[in-house]
């Protein structure tokens, strides 16, 4: 039964608010995976370890992590046998950000600063004058066992700032502002004057190992937050993050104003669709495929890592699930029967820069997820994969849009072409429309969350039947 206008808006906003929770709990890729892990465990998925043997059973649900920054979750259909296909949705856990250098201790004209490195292709000017903090992981040595352990850290208050230079000292700042990423993107942590007032005159003598690399006040903040002593911290991987939470906005609360929508929007929709598709035991019981979500780290820097889409991770997992002594070519048989949605955000047409889009391909808010096509294979979509997803979308009532870039414009890429070429897998590139991609604060629409989630859930439930009607190799 169709929902009335009010009920539909309530459903749209409820789903969008769940995305807000997901984003606010995920200030780094490590936190993304921790949040996904928590949701999967709550939904009855069982954790696997790559280093152990697996006993994969139909109608059961599993997940594994690598580097604590990539996660793969899958549910095995009740009718699955080795050689059957995989229904996959892939996305990425990382977003452009600034990351703390291994030796971050910097001081200039009385300010204590933190040296940072750019990660990905961020719009770095948007990081100025923001209330920034730190999130990520530290590796500690347990004083009792001597083991190396990981701890997640997220200091939930502003501790860092990158101030703009006053316009009086740079009159052309509104015409030409391009910060030098090595010199101008160094956040302020504290002043030396205040540190002396807080601590008193420091004792002369050699600095400790961590104090040589990082300011003592930074280490003190981290240790206080984690309840650790400074000498227990071996290494750190820390991202800078905005402390302003993700929110709904606009006169009708139809917009999502948030950090890291590229690509936490897709991560959330993919993961929740997998969980929701398994909520009915009957749905999974009659599925001949394996439903799978693959969320990779390091997409924003090329995916060439042990936990990235360029690695052997996906192939190894698919091979382990397919393995059968009675059917030695099960993996090779499964790949042509499989399909992946490469889920990554799409550029909505901008009201102030509409000429940047090709005139017949201008995605709008509220009009559905966007199929992304590029003849130069920057996206992996083709006529076959597009037709199959259109069939699914039609059955679940989700509208679709199209995006092709102008001939005189560069085109980004995704994990789609990587996995299509690496596995020989049929792939479609698709994403929800957004504005301000790679800004510290991005913009999407509330409708896009429910539309994308509905499409993804429909894909998991319907793809096996849709694929049986495909007469193309």
Curated annotation (Swiss-Prot):
Q: How is its activity regulated?
A: One of the zinc ions is readily exchangeable with other divalent cations such as manganese, which strongly stimulates the enzymatic activity.
- Co-factor remark: Binds 2 Zn(2+) ions per subunit.
What UniProt keywords apply to this chain's record, in alphabetical order? Aminopeptidase, Cytoplasm, Hydrolase, Metal-binding, Metalloprotease, Phosphoprotein, Protease, Zinc
The source's superkingdom equals Eukaryota
Task: Quote the catalytic activity from the record.
Answer: Release of an N-terminal aspartate or glutamate from a peptide, with a preference for aspartate
Q: Which GO terms describe its molecular function?
A: aminopeptidase activity; identical protein binding; metallopeptidase activity; zinc ion binding
Query: Is the keyword Nuclease assigned to this protein?
Result: no
- Detail which positions bind substrate: 168, 299, 344, 347, 372, 379
Q: Where in the cell is it found?
A: Cytoplasm
Q: Which Pfam families match?
A: Peptidase_M18 (PF02127)
Q: What is its main location?
A: cytoplasm
Assembly description: Tetrahedron-shaped homododecamer built from six homodimers.
**PANTHER family with a match to the protein in the record:** ASPARTYL AMINOPEPTIDASE
The name this protein goes by in its record = Aspartyl aminopeptidase
Which species expresses this protein natively?
A: Mus musculus (Mouse)
